[in-house]
A protein has these predicted regions:
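Surface-exposed loop/turn motifs in large extracellular/passenger domains
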Residues: 1-115, 120-145, 152-176
């Protein structure tokens, strides 16, 4: 258990792997804000395998133009921690930032209060020319965006890219804001 407002962070162009763990954290992310897309950093890979995560903030990339290439969640449980005042939990990219792929398999996701961004997807105001993919397989997912967008996909005022969403053999409850 990490103390209040503590998180697992990595700098730009790094990777994070969480395996066989029980985490109580503020977030698991790369925290990089850039002034323009030309200066943007990317989290290469975030992997959560056979773990339980209670979080209050982003799992992926945080900050303007902070993108994530790949998120893999396998055999894990991820829930929103109501203790934290921000509750901005989003699995994916930050504001004005994209993601490559988010692959959730054999997992339980419960994020019922994402703020200003989808619970699974990218942050708001994303303009990018790429194809992204969200795959949910053999999982139970309950997600909600409190405002400015859908629960799964692209946030408010996003465009120019394409997101493919694939749901296989799963129970998904998703409510947009």
């Amino acid at each position: 258990k990490l103390p209040h407002f503590r998180s697992i962070r990595v700098g730009g162009n790094g990777s994070i792997a969480v395996r066989d763990s029980d985490l109580h954290t503020y977030g698991i992310f790369m925290d990089e804000t850039a002034q323009s897309p030309n200066d943007a950093k990317t989290l290469k890979k975030l992997e959560i395998t056979d773990s339980t995560v209670l979080t209050g903030d982003i799992i992926g990339a945080r900050g303007e133009y902070a993108s994530v290439e790949e998120i893999v969640i396998r055999g894990s449980s991820i829930r929103l921690n109501e203790e934290y005042p921000y509750n901005r939990c989003t699995i994916g990219g930050g504001e004005q930032a994209s993601f490559g792929s988010i692959d959730i398999q054999d997992s339980q996701i419960d994020i019922t209060s994402s703020l200003n961004a989808p619970a699974i997807g990218n942050g708001w105001q994303v303009y990018y020319n790429r194809e992204s993919r969200i795959r949910i397989a053999n999982s139970e997912v309950s997600v909600r965006c409190a405002s400015l967008g859908p629960a799964i996909g692209a946030a408010w005022d996003s465009g120019s890219g394409r997101i493919n969403i694939i749901i296989e053999n799963s129970t998904v409850t998703a409510k947009g804001g």
